[in-house]
C-alpha cells in the first residue's frame, strides 16, 4: 500500500470509528440501567462486559477512557454508569498493566534496591524508579487539591460532554504537533529523572476529563524527543501508581457505601473484561508504535470531539 493510500486509509478508519462511537447507538443494547445503591448503576452482565471492553481499549490508547465511558453508555441509551462503576472496572486495567509489566517492575525494584544498598546512585534502575516516583507526585498533589477544594468536581461543568469534546480536540492538535516536531531519538535506556517529572506534570492534566492519561504523557514524551514506543512504555509504567491509587480510593468509598444486591456479578464481569482488553490494548499499542505513527489516534480524537459537539448541537446528546 502506497504512503498516500495508507494515509487515506488511516483517516477514513479513524473518522468512521469516531462517528460510530458517538452517532450510532446499538439498539440491541439499549435497555437503560436502573439506579442501584452505593453509587453504582444496576446493569446486566452484557452491559458490564461491553463497558469493560470500552475501559480496556481506551485506558491505554491515547483517546481517553473517561470520555468514552461517559459517551458510549449514553449513546447506547444506558445512561451514565456512575463514577463508582468506572472506578471499580479500572481495577481490571490495573491488573492488566501489572501483569504485562511484571518483569520490568521486578527488575526495576530489585535493581533500585540493590543500588541503594551499594550506594550506587548513578544506577539506571534507581534513576528510573525515582523518575516514576517524581512523576506520580503532580497528579497526587493536584488530585488532593481538587478533592479538598472542589468536593462536587464529579458533577461540575468541566465533566460535561461539551468540555470533554473540547479537551479531546485540543489534545488531538497537541499530539499532532508532537508527532510533527518530535525528534524521536531517545530510547528506553536513555530516560532520565527529568523525563519522569515532566511526563508526570503532563499526566496531571488527565484530571481534566477527555484529556487522556496515555494521550497527554505520550504527547509530552514526543515533545521531549522520545521514540514513540519508549514514550508509550514509560507512560504505562508511570501510570501504575496513579491508576492504582485512584482505583483504591474509589473502591474504599464504594465499599463504605455498600454494593446493591445483584450488582456484584456484573461488576466482576466488567473487571474481567477490562483486564483482558486492557492487556490486548497495551500489547497492541506497543507493537503498533514500533513501526507506525500516532496519526490514526490524532484523527480519531479530532473527529470524536467534533462529533460530540455536533451531536449536542443537534440534540442527539445532552451536554450533561
UniProtKB/Swiss-Prot annotation:
It comes from the Bacteria. Its main location: membrane. The chain crosses the membrane at residues 9-29, 82-102, 130-150, 161-181, 191-211, 236-256, 265-285, 296-316. Bacitracin is thought to be involved in the inhibition of peptidoglycan synthesis by sequestering undecaprenyl diphosphate, thereby reducing the pool of lipid carrier available. Pfam families: BacA (PF02673). It catalyses: di-trans,octa-cis-undecaprenyl diphosphate + H2O = di-trans,octa-cis-undecaprenyl phosphate + phosphate + H(+). GO terms for biological process: cell wall organization; peptidoglycan biosynthetic process; regulation of cell shape; response to antibiotic. It is a multi-pass membrane protein. Its EC number is 3.6.1.27. Keywords: Antibiotic resistance, Cell inner membrane, Cell membrane, Cell shape, Cell wall biogenesis/degradation, Hydrolase, Membrane, Peptidoglycan synthesis, Transmembrane, Transmembrane helix. This is Undecaprenyl-diphosphatase. Belongs to the UppP family. NCBIfam families: PRK00281.2-5, undec_PP_bacA. One of its GO terms (cellular component) is plasma membrane. HAMAP family: Undec_diphosphatase. The gene is uppP. GO terms for molecular function: undecaprenyl-diphosphatase activity. It is found in: Cell inner membrane. The keyword Hydrolase applies. It comes from Nostoc sp. (strain PCC 7120 / SAG 25.82 / UTEX 2576). InterPro entries: UppP. Catalyzes the dephosphorylation of undecaprenyl diphosphate (UPP). Confers resistance to bacitracin. The keyword Transmembrane applies.
Amino acid at each position: 500500500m502506497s504512503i498516500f493510500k495508507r494515509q487515506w486509509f488511516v483517516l477514513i478508519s479513524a473518522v468512521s470509528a469516531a462517528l460510530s462511537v458517538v452517532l450510532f447507538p446499538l439498539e440491541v443494547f439499549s435497555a437503560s440501567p436502573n439506579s442501584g445503591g452505593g453509587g453504582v448503576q444496576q446493569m446486566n452482565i452484557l452491559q458490564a462486559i461491553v463497558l469493560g471492553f470500552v475501559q480496556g481499549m481506551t485506558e491505554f490508547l491515547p483517546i481517553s477512557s473517561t470520555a468514552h465511558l461517559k459517551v458510549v453508555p449514553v449513546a447506547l441509551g444506558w445512561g451514565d454508569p456512575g463514577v463508582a462503576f468506572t472506578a471499580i472496572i479500572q481495577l481490571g486495567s490495573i491488573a492488566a498493566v501489572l501483569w504485562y509489566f511484571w518483569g520490568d517492575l521486578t527488575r526495576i525494584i530489585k535493581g533500585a534496591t540493590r543500588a541503594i544498598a551499594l550506594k550506587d546512585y548513578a544506577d539506571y534502575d534507581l534513576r528510573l524508579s525515582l523518575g516514576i516516583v517524581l512523576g506520580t507526585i503532580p497528579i497526587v498533589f493536584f488530585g488532593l487539591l481538587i478533592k479538598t477544594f472542589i468536593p462536587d468536581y464529579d458533577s461540575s461543568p468541566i465533566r460535561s460532554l461539551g468540555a470533554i469534546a473540547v479537551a479531546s480536540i485540543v489534545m488531538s492538535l497537541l499530539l499532532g504537533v508532537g508527532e510533527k516536531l518530535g525528534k524521536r531519538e531517545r530510547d528506553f535506556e536513555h530516560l532520565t529523572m527529568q523525563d519522569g517529572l515532566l511526563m508526570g506534570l503532563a499526566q496531571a492534566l488527565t484530571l481534566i476529563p477527555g484529556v487522556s492519561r496515555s494521550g497527554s504523557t505520550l504527547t509530552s514524551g514526543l515533545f521531549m524527543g522520545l521514540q514513540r514506543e519508549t514514550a508509550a512504555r514509560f507512560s504505562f509504567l508511570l501510570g501504575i501508581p496513579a491508576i492504582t491509587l485512584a482505583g483504591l480510593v474509589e473502591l474504599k468509598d464504594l465499599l463504605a457505601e455498600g454494593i446493591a444486591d445483584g450488582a456484584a456479578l456484573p461488576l466482576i464481569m466488567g473487571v474481567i473484561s477490562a483486564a483482558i482488553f486492557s492487556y490486548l490494548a497495551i500489547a497492541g499499542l506497543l507493537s503498533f508504535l514500533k513501526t507506525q505513527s500516532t496519526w490514526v489516534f490524532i484523527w480519531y480524537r479530532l473527529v470524536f470531539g467534533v462529533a460530540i459537539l455536533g451531536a449536542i448541537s443537534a440534540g442527539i446528546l445532552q451536554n450533561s
